């Protein structure tokens, strides 16, 4: 498996190849063939450095480049088989830097001058991720920075900068509503909407600073927003802007919509425009429970197949923690596995308190799912709950290449029948994985008939099993 090879590479190799944090585009680190892109043989997945890669992750923050101990955090993720992080370009937490320079005497920002600390942190983050072959999914704009309390500290607020006034910018000094109320003119600056060049020139300058650092790296995915409900013209503008700036370099873009319902018209603005968006992020489906959480992506998967434009489906944030509001810890753990068994290309635990982050529970699941997918060729498997009978509503989930190999996930023990007719007469190996302990049970061999009865070693707990035709 590609990940195992990467895991053994000395982390200093990439660092030794570059003498600066941000290589110029003329000396890009990787050729297009090595950049992250849909897998040529199965575009529902990603390929990186020319080979398929399954992206798994979790982290303590969403704007991960801002944290102090980032290197140790990435080392931990890498050590357990993780290779995927989220990177909102957000600044609203205590201790975060903003993307513009601030005058220490006046306390005002100059939107003509980049913020050195902010961009230094981002450059370092890019370098550290690349050295560990960790893919980062950037979100250019996080709407929660532009309303309520964070807006009071935001450099774009006219009261906080020396570049424009309230009247000149059309921006409000106070926005007390949830950003979903769309009170801010910030997200209407593009030509197709209000064509507000007073703001837009500085927005472009900020994205230029981001791109001159990020584009040379091959391991970056670009998402326009965090759970937006703004006009699709906003995301369209920035997707086209990134593509224009990238030139001949391959870039992968998407938009993340606010709607929890994947059938919402919002999501069609991504799904129906593959010329703009190379992948679909369905993170908001992680508000859904149990079998519903499984069923919704299957409808989207079929919609993508019917479109003739196969693309990866990503899940960059999985809600669910006992400390949060969007499902409990069990929900988060189950969703992590259902995503991958349901055919998604990525699965990542959201930061606390709404997700499990990279705590001990998340670590066990990342390690175990990586162990399991290293035992099968996940890139040739497809969701196959149709092969399960005598199955409870949320009892088991199956991905398979029928006649070759099968993998099942049990959220809380179980006893089901697996249709192995495609392998009838063949010898099968059966091996159980205790997910919480990240340990395998001894292999058991049997002969395939029409159905195989699979009973978890214990009546409760998170279990997975791999069934393979023996050579």
Regions found by a protein language model. Give the residues of each.
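Sec-dependent signal peptide recognition
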Residues: 2-11
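N-terminal low-complexity, Pro/Thr/Ser-rich intrinsically disordered segments
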Residues: 23-36
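Active-site mouth of glycoside hydrolases
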Residues: 33-35, 40-277, 289
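Extracellular glycoside hydrolase catalytic/binding regions
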Residues: 202-205, 216-363
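Aromatic- and carboxylate-lined catalytic core of secreted/periplasmic carbohydrate-active enzymes
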Residues: 312, 320-323, 328-444, 455-471
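Short strand-edge motifs at loop-to-beta-strand transitions and within beta-strands
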Residues: 450-452
């Amino acid at each position: 498996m590609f990940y195992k090879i990467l895991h053994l590479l000395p982390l200093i190799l990439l660092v030794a190849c570059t003498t600066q944090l941000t290589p110029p585009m003329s000396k890009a680190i990787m050729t297009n063939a090595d950049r992250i892109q849909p897998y040529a043989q199965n575009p529902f997945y990603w390929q990186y450095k020319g080979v398929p890669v399954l992206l798994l992750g979790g982290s303590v923050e969403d704007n991960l480049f801002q944290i102090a101990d980032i290197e140790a955090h990435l080392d931990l993720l890498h050590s357990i088989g993780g290779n995927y992080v989220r990177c909102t370009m957000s600044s609203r937490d205590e201790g975060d830097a903003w993307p513009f320079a601030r005058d220490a005497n006046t306390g005002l920002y100059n939107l003509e001058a980049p913020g050195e600390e902010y961009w230094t942190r981002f450059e370092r983050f890019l370098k550290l991720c690349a050295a560990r072959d960790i893919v980062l999914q950037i979100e250019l704009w996080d709407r929660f920075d532009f309303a309520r309390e964070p807006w009071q500290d935001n450099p774009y607020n006219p009261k906080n900068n020396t570049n424009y006034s309230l009247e000149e910018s059309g921006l409000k000094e106070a926005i007390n509503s949830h950003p979903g109320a769309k009170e801010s003119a910030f997200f209407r600056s593009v030509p197709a909407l209000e064509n507000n060049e007073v703001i837009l020139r500085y927005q472009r300058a900020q994205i230029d600073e981001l791109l001159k650092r990020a584009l040379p790296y091959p391991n970056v995915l670009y998402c326009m927003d965090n759970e937006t409900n703004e006009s699709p013209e906003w995301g369209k503008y920035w997707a086209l802007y990134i593509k224009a700036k990238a030139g001949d370099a391959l870039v992968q873009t998407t938009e993340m919509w606010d709607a929890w319902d994947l059938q919402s018209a919002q999501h069609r603005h991504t799904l129906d425009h593959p010329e703009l968006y190379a992948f679909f992020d369905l993170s908001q489906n992680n508000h859904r429970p149990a079998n519903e959480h499984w069923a919704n992506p299957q409808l989207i998967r079929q919609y993508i197949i019917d479109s003739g434009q196969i693309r990866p489906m990503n899940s960059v944030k999985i809600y669910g923690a006992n400390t949060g509001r969007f499902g409990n810890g069990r929900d988060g753990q189950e969703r992590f596995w259902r995503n991958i068994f349901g055919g998604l290309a990525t699965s990542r635990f959201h930061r606390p308190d709404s997700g499990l982050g990279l705590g001990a529970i998340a670590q066990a699941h990342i390690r175990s799912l990586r162990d399991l997918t290293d035992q099968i060729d996940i890139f040739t498997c497809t969701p196959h709950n149709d092969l399960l009978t005598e199955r409870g509503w949320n009892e088991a989930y199956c991905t398979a290449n029928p006649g070759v190999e099968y993998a099942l996930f049990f959220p809380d023990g179980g006893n089901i029948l697996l249709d192995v007719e495609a392998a009838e007469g063949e010898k099968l190996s059966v091996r159980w994985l205790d997910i919480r302990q990240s340990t395998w049970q001894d292999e058991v061999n049997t002969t395939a008939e029409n159905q195989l009865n699979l009973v978890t070693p214990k009546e409760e707990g998170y279990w997975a099993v791999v069934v393979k035709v023996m050579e």
